[in-house]
A protein has these predicted regions:
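Extracytoplasmic
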Residues: 16-44, 48, 128-129, 238-243
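Extracytoplasmic gate region of multi-pass secondary transporters
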Residues: 35-39, 216-263, 267
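Central cavity-lining transmembrane alpha-helices of secondary-active solute carriers
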Residues: 58-73, 263-275
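C-terminal ends and interior cores of transmembrane alpha-helices
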Residues: 89-104, 294-307
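Helix-loop-helix hairpin linking two adjacent transmembrane segments in secondary transporters
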Residues: 104, 144, 148-199
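Hydrophobic core of transmembrane alpha-helices in multi-pass small-molecule transporters
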Residues: 107-124, 310-325
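Cytoplasmic helix-loop-helix junction between adjacent transmembrane helices
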Residues: 111-150
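Intracellular juxtamembrane helix-capping segments at the cytosolic ends
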Residues: 123-137, 323-338
Length: 398
């Protein structure tokens, strides 16, 4: 039997649109990556606590919760391309507003701008994530989304690298955001003038069942939503306080820690996503997810109880394990949505609000206990649930 092609389906070749959409993954990876450097930067610049600085994450990830359903409505009414363009425009406007923001120099104004950027990122992710899953054979959906997310991983590397070297060197915060804003709006202009396919028939060809008629699938989708919520909570919490942890427990400077985050943590994150897209051609996605959940659980436990070089190595292992989690959980959960893919995508994107919750809780724990390490018990619990979700898929044919 011929193996299904990753980019061909029903006589159509979706390679070119796949490459175009995948390039967008870098943009929001960069936006999230530089956000993690903003956290300690704002702590120093505005002399605020860890829990207060976590409002930066709360603004961006809170936007995912508020904007996901409107973004889904835009996609259902006008298609994926309009959803992407809307996201790029909001992203670009929010980034360019950092120019007057640097003159106003108010923490809360920056939080507002990050909320606008978060709304743009929501539209981008709500459009692009499900779009990659239908640009080819359904059986290769997990491989495609992991390959796309590999570019997202590069953005996560470049973000803290650029942000850390500029912000901790005293460079005006408006400079990196202004450059990103100009680039993003230019991409929006280009996309507004080209035509992209909308393979809605691919969704309809997969199944004629309605998700409401399958209570078991509704429960499975709900578990997928919870798992994605906890993953984003864990990832954001880890990213937000890596630099603080490195300074306190590993005794390295913030600028050096940002390099470790960019090249070590995010470098392995990128490699893991790239390798994951290939491995899932041969190994069931749920098994890869289970292995990564075990790795992240053990690594986080080491981060909590140890310090020094061992905990730094554990952090690197943690980033490697995290790499395939978001796209794999997203794609597995989307399988339980039947024909309701666009609505399901909006609901899944809403779960990214988990990123607004964990940093605040972890910041509060760190401020009250005086230990950043203890706060990492929060992502530890999250990784345990992710392992349970992977096990729950063992009876589901993949």
């Amino acid at each position: 039997m011929t193996k299904p092609s990753i980019f061909r389906y029903e006589g159509h070749n979706y390679l070119v649109p796949f490459l175009i959409i995948s390039s967008l993954f870098f943009m929001w990876g960069f936006a999230h990556g530089i956000l993690e450097v903003l956290n300690p930067h704002f702590q120093e610049s505005f002399h605020i606590s860890k829990v207060m600085s976590a409002l930066t994450q709360a603004a961006v990830y809170g936007a995912y919760f508020l904007m996901a359903l409107p973004a889904g409505w835009i996609i259902r009414k006008w298609g994926y391309r309009r959803g992407v363009i809307t996201g790029l425009v909001l992203f670009g406007i929010g980034a360019l507003m950092f120019i007057p923001g640097s003159r106003i120099n108010s923490f809360y104004f920056f939080v507002l701008l990050l909320f606008v950027i978060g709304c743009g990122l929501t539209c981008l992710e709500t459009s692009a994530n499900p779009y990659t899953t239908v640009l080819g054979h359904p059986d290769k959906a997990e491989s495609r989304i992991n390959l796309s997310q590999s570019l997202n991983g590069i953005g996560w590397i470049v973000g803290p690298l650029v942000g850390g070297q500029l912000l901790f060197s005293g460079i005006n915060i408006a400079i990196p955001y202004a450059l990103v804003g100009i680039f993003v709006l230019a991409v929006a202009l280009v996309l507004s003038r080209i035509k992209l396919p909308d393979p809605r028939r691919a969704h309809e060809a997969d199944t004629n069942e309605k998700v409401e008629e399958k209570p078991v699938r509704v429960m499975a989708f709900g578990f997928g939503m919870l798992t994605l919520f906890l993953y984003v909570a864990a990832q954001t919490g880890v990213n937000s306080f890596f630099i603080n942890y490195a300074e306190e427990s590993i005794h390295i400077e913030k600028q050096t820690a940002s390099l470790y985050l960019a090249f070590g943590g995010m470098g392995l994150f990128f490699i893991g996503r790239l390798a994951g897209g290939v491995i899932m051609n041969y190994v069931q996605p749920r098994l890869v997810l289970l292995a990564c959940a075990i790795l992240t659980f053990v690594a986080t436990l080491i981060v909590v109880v140890c310090s020094g070089t061992l905990s730094l190595i554990a952090f690197f292992a943690l980033y490697l394990g995290e790499s395939i989690m978001f796209p794999t959980i997203f794609s597995l959960a989307l399988r339980d949505a039947g024909t309701k893919t666009k609505l399901a995508s909006s609901l899944l994107i809403m779960t990214i609000v988990g990123g607004a919750v964990a940093p605040v809780i972890m910041g509060y724990i760190a401020d009250t206990t005086g230990s950043m390490a203890i706060a990492f018990l929060i992502p530890l619990v999250c990784y345990g649930v992710i392992g349970g979700y992977a096990l729950s898929k063992r009876h589901v044919p993949l």
